[in-house]
């Protein structure tokens, strides 16, 4: 979801649709490659299939290559998602519960995977088209829980993400105060399990 048309597409109008998708995918990958680390505030709005607002929220979002992700919803209710490069930890303070799963298991079915994965195998699972400064990402598998993801840039800065699920709900995340992450802040990608919480270990190699 970014860039209207690449220079290659403009100069070669007889490109096949398959080649166009491949080119737009490479443009998006190049954009994301320039973002080695990112930390930003976000404002979230969720609407249902009838465009009725069903949720608002705000928090902190961060990512670092490779395979590190941080999502801290601070309002209206707190929740935390941390991908440390190997596992994904999901913490619900209100329920006093932590869920943990393998990174690939957690994000392989979501276009969000492209934010932290750069391997060809992962990228081959999605089609990418561009539209007026944004890139639309759709999984090729009909079993994916997310219908599509739109990511938008202002030059090299990631400014917006829009997720649509298979029920027609749309989550829009507007980013602000984007900065690179310094060495001291990388600790945010390490999750420490709080005392006195239930742990739901869904990792494939978990010992039951």
Swiss-Prot record:
The keyword Transport applies. InterPro entries: LolA/LolB/LppX, OM_lipoprot_carrier_LolA-like, OM_lipoprot_carrier_LolA_Pbac. Its main location: periplasm. It is found in: Periplasm. Residues 1-22 form the signal peptide. GO terms for biological process: lipoprotein localization to outer membrane; lipoprotein transport. The keyword Chaperone applies. Keywords: Chaperone, Periplasm, Protein transport, Signal, Transport. One of its GO terms (cellular component) is outer membrane-bounded periplasmic space. Belongs to the LolA family. Monomer. Participates in the translocation of lipoproteins from the inner membrane to the outer membrane. Only forms a complex with a lipoprotein if the residue after the N-terminal Cys is not an aspartate (The Asp acts as a targeting signal to indicate that the lipoprotein should stay in the inner membrane). This is Outer-membrane lipoprotein carrier protein. It comes from Shewanella woodyi (strain ATCC 51908 / MS32). The gene is lolA.
